[in-house]
């Protein structure tokens, strides 16, 4: 607990002093005003707390797995079907929490596309097992946008043990998610979030890499497909090699249909078979060198 910093509450009385696990998320001024992380506050006495109104709109759903497909070597796209007649009233950039029961999964049972199995074998990951004795809760950003109704779509990267140290624990939730198959039942709750677009005419610059694609896709699709925004916007995405890129056709289509949108990919480790003649390096450096360095007013952009 205490790693994501999303469960902020205002504690007006009780709760004790702020813990070291909270100090990375809460500064001294906020702590003085009573800001705490709910997951770190032990209830040992009567307390007075204040939570945001939107928390009371949180619901729980039992969903069914539609598909759980590889999009990159270590990234899956999990699609969940919301129960008939119900909806998750989320905003682009929002997230849900997903529950994993106690489980024992073997990586050798994962459904991994043939084109990616070589890397899994090379690192010995098919020998990994994940054994979890308690329920687990984790937050994931939606990759779909509000008009893609009836589903929740997530981009999930597997948290494997480091190569050569396979005795270390694997990611509890990502291992569970990678084990899911069509028809399985999954419990989620939400919606949550604060990473929402501001309603201005300012230029938008989206930056992401790997499974960080999820909120970027949600935002960009929402701006261009639902809101039909005319704001200038660009998406800068970083991947290791060409095989780690995904949703290219979607973004190429958006760029072709919207003069105000461009997207750029930089590969940090292009392979010989990629025949890559595009941008290379880490995406934050590429963004600065290729665009922001000569931008007339980068401080006016929304990132």
Curated annotation (Swiss-Prot):
Entries under Pfam families matching the protein? FAD_binding_6, NAD_binding_1
Sites binding [2Fe-2S] cluster sit at 4, 7, 39
2Fe-2S ferredoxin-type domain: residues covered: 1-45
Compartments annotated for it: namely: Cell inner membrane
EC number(s) given by UniProt: 7.2.1.1
The UniProt annotation puts the region (Catalytic) at: 201-303
- Entries under PANTHER family matching the protein: NA(+)-TRANSLOCATING NADH-QUINONE REDUCTASE SUBUNIT, NAD(P)H-FLAVIN REDUCTASE
Q: What is this protein called?
A: Na(+)-translocating NADH-quinone reductase subunit F
Q: What is the lineage of its organism?
A: Bacteria, Pseudomonadati, Pseudomonadota, Gammaproteobacteria, Alteromonadales
């Amino acid at each position: 607990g205490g790693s994501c910093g999303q469960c902020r509450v205002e504690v007006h009385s009780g709760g004790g002093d702020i813990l070291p696990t909270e100090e990375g998320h809460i500064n001294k001024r906020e702590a003085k005003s009573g800001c705490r992380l709910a997951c770190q506050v032990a209830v040992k006495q009567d307390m007075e707390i204040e939570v945001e109104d939107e928390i009371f709109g949180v619901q729980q759903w039992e969903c069914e797995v539609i598909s759980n497909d590889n999009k990159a070597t270590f990234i899956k796209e999990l699609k969940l079907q919301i129960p008939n007649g119900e909806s998750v009233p989320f905003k682009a950039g929002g997230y849900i929490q997903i529950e994993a029961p106690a489980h024992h999964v073997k990586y050798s049972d994962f459904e991994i596309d043939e084109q990616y199995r070589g890397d899994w074998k090379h690192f010995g990951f098919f020998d990994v097992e994940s054994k979890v004795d308690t329920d687990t809760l984790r937050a994931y950003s939606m990759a779909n946008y509000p008009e893609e109704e009836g589903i929740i779509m997530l981009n999930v990267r597997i948290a494997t043990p480091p190569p050569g140290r396979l005795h270390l624990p694997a990611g509890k939730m990502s291992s569970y998610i990678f084990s899911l198959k069509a028809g399985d039942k999954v419990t989620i709750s939400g919606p949550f979030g604060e990473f929402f677009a501001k309603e201005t005419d300012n230029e938008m610059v989206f930056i992401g890499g790997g499974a960080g694609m999820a909120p970027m896709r949600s935002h960009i699709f929402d701006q261009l497909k639902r809101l039909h925004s005319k704001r200038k916007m660009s998406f800068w995405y970083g991947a290791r090699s060409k095989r780690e890129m995904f949703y290219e056709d979607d973004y190429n289509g958006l760029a072709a249909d919207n003069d105000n949108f461009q997207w750029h990919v930089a590969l940090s480790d292009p392979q010989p078979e990629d025949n890559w003649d595009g941008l290379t390096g880490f995406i934050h450096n590429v963004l600065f060198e290729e665009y922001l360095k000569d931008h007339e007013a980068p401080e006016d952009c929304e990132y």
